[in-house]
Amino acid sequence: QIFIGQRFDKDKSAWQMPQGGIDKGESPAKAVIREMKEETGIKKNYKIIYECKTWYFYKLPSYLRKKLWKGRFIGQKQKWFIISFTGKDEDINIKTKKPEFKKWEWSTQDNILKKIVPFKRRLYTSIFKEINNIDG
């Protein structure tokens, strides 16, 4: 099962896996833990078990480019990780200082591909392809 959250966007179908930026001087592994804590409230019972080998990129549709990120970017380059969470659902708290999600759920890859915004489908398909082919 994979954690996904429904964003506080006008588009009620805006579900996604947690993600975020890498601060200056921060490693991707440190950034993923910081973002996970900020977006899910998870503080313990987790472990990074895989770092994707590829940096993934997606482009925003042209109608969103001016609305998001003040028009400064056309998309995002991302590094993805698999994190094992062995805690309880009660350890998850999306009502953080700056909440990004209004709802969350555990989901399957197929269901996630149905729920996310269409412009991220190719990205998520590529990520799932890589993690489904991990040896061991």
Residue ranges and their predicted role:
Residues 109-136:
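Charged phosphate-binding loop/patch that engages nucleotide di/tri-phosphates or the phosphate backbone
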Residues 23-118:
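Unchanged
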Residues 1-17:
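N-terminal strand-loop-strand
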Residues 10, 37, 123-124:
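Sequence-pattern detector for short linear motifs
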Residues 13, 25, 126-127:
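A periodicity- and composition-biased signal for non-globular, repetitive helical segments
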